[in-house]
Amino acid sequence: MSTPVLELRGIVKTFGATRALDGASLRVAAGSVHGLVGENGAGKSTLIKVLAGIHRPDAGSLLLDGQPHGHFSPRQVERLGIGFIHQERLLPARFTVGEALFFGHERRFGPLLDRRSQQREAARLLDDYFGLRLPANALIGELSSAEQQMVQIVRALLIKPRVLVFDEPSVALVQREVERLLRIVQRLRDDGLAIVYISHYLQEIEALCDRVTVLRNGRDVAEVSPRNTSLEQITRLMVNREVGELYPKVAVPAGALLLDVRGLGRARAYQGIDLQVRRGEIVGLTGLVGSGAKELLRSLFGLAPPDSGEVRLDGQPLSLRSPREAVAQGVALMPEERRRQGVALDLSVQENTTLAALSRFVRLGLLSPARERHTTLELIERLRIKAHGAHAKVRQLSGGNQQKVALAKWFARCSSLYLLDEPSVGIDVGAKVEIYRLIGELVKEGAGVLILSSDLPELIGLCDRIHVMHRGAIAARFAAGEANSDRLLAVATGAQRAQNEERPFYAYAIAI
């Protein structure tokens, strides 16, 4: 690499007795996308806060174009041409698009704020950069997550940065929005910017990055090229263990039949679904978008009631007319959209944990905060939730800990059937292992688990059986030990037929 535009060299940062960064380094070239990956606690956030001027390092240096710079304030960072796209949308909800774009860089006509000029320029910039036609007087709070992010990117580009840092930019986006984001990043790279891209989604890292720095325990342990390094190798560098160790296999003999689905159908979604889950069993479900797998899981929780067929739970008919009825009969759902549907971000850990089981904490007609707190503290310890007590806001927790809180509320209710929709999406590898451990605890206690996942290695590593849906039907079934990525992908592409089916099935694999 020629002289990098940006270099962080030997950065050390301690907080009390905790050494968050232990000589970490990062080198980023112009016209490249440089990935930064690592488990929670590896030091990614601290390193970026040092770069942003929020934290003063105890040792180490920052160089721009090979020239050393001392510690600087966030405002000075901006003047040096370093911009940031943060995971959390930081633009005030009551600002207009024009106000948000030019906040801190307001346009004036004499002593007066020139709002009209700002609004015209804001609309032009959004259209020029992204073809996004938003009214400049639209409120930020009325925009989608993707639209807010576009505003944030344009705002960062107004300082004419040479370095742009994307911190978990795709967390709140749906797939088509992620694809647009990746195209934008590629365009910025082609324009000559040096991009730092931080993500738990290693598929994005593989597709986008020219180089990747791996952090572990506050140190940069490797800098690799995704073209020459597999995602499994990157994962191994992150966690310092073999990929096979990520999936703790739980030796639990299958128990009595828990969920029995016969001939289930829903118009324009799926038909003729037969599916069984026994107590102590983990069953996998996968399929392309539109295959019917997502709709099937929603139906089993009463969100999209089926039109035909029969579902029994513990031998009794299961009513699927509403989520309320499903929950009352022992069904739990952990949705993919964790931040929107799985937890209430502005409520505390305690309020989230007890939300689905409030009747357990009522005495003499009144809610008992003491009993709520006792149960919450037990679950915080059992699920190893990292939070500053039961009253910490869920918004303040990492993605992995938010996922644990989403699961904790069903632990509190002692549900018998757990429907897990993409349970490890958007969390780092270490947090995934914790979620897998908790899934193992559920089956040890006699629950049944149905996992919908697009991560084939995850399904292969965890499940006793895997069902694959295609065009609204279960097209293939695999027992544990029968499936591997090569075989699944061969069948998925139509190159090979499943031995136990007359037609091919289709699935897609997303590595760890």
UniProtKB/Swiss-Prot annotation:
Q: What is its EC number?
A: 7.5.2.7
Q: Which residues form a coiled coil?
A: none
One GO location term (cellular component)? plasma membrane
Q: Name one GO molecular function term.
A: ABC-type D-ribose transporter activity
Q: Which UniProt keywords apply?
A: ATP-binding, Cell inner membrane, Cell membrane, Membrane, Nucleotide-binding, Repeat, Sugar transport, Translocase, Transport
Query: Which catalytic reaction applies to this protein?
Result: D-ribose(out) + ATP + H2O = D-ribose(in) + ADP + phosphate + H(+)
Superkingdom is Bacteria
The subcellular localization recorded is:
Cell inner membrane
Membrane association type:
Peripheral membrane protein
Q: Which PROSITE patterns match?
A: ABC_TRANSPORTER_1, ABC_TRANSPORTER_2, RBSA
This protein's major location comes to membrane
State whether it acts alone or in a complex, and with which partners, per the record: The complex is composed of an ATP-binding protein (RbsA), two transmembrane proteins (RbsC) and a solute-binding protein (RbsB).
The identity of this protein, by name, is Ribose import ATP-binding protein RbsA
